[in-house]
Amino acid sequence: MTAFSLADLDRIVRSRAAASPDQSYTAKLVAAGPAKPAKKLGEEAVEAAIAAVQGDRAGLVSEAADVLYHLLVVLVGSGVALEDVMAELERRTAQGGLAEKASRGRP
């Protein structure tokens, strides 16, 4: 297992988002507004799902990395801290899966 973490990627994305859009793909995505990085996130998620269905392990690893990167770009562009997402995951995992899902009050 690598020592590289989601928090490490978050720091990199935040740093690159603060750069000039002329010099950073991340900054260019963030500067384009929320629709562009959200669209990329959706595209990468679909590609990851396709790789999973096809049993393409290497493709799934690659696409999952793209999903995580683009999710962090969306979070940064939306002003949402990774820590907030992690706190929500921690809250949810404190209960069993079905009990947690029922507590959300969604249909």
Curated annotation (Swiss-Prot):
Lineage: Bacteria, Pseudomonadati, Pseudomonadota, Alphaproteobacteria, Hyphomicrobiales
HAMAP family in the record: HisE
Substrates-to-products reaction catalysed: 1-(5-phospho-beta-D-ribosyl)-ATP + H2O = 1-(5-phospho-beta-D-ribosyl)-5'-AMP + diphosphate + H(+)
Cell membrane is among the record's keywords: no
GO molecular function annotations of the record: ATP binding; phosphoribosyl-ATP diphosphatase activity
Gene Ontology biological process terms, A to Z: L-histidine biosynthetic process
Key words, A-Z: Amino-acid biosynthesis, ATP-binding, Cytoplasm, Histidine biosynthesis, Hydrolase, Nucleotide-binding
Protein name in the entry: Phosphoribosyl-ATP pyrophosphatase
Record-linked Pfam families: PRA-PH
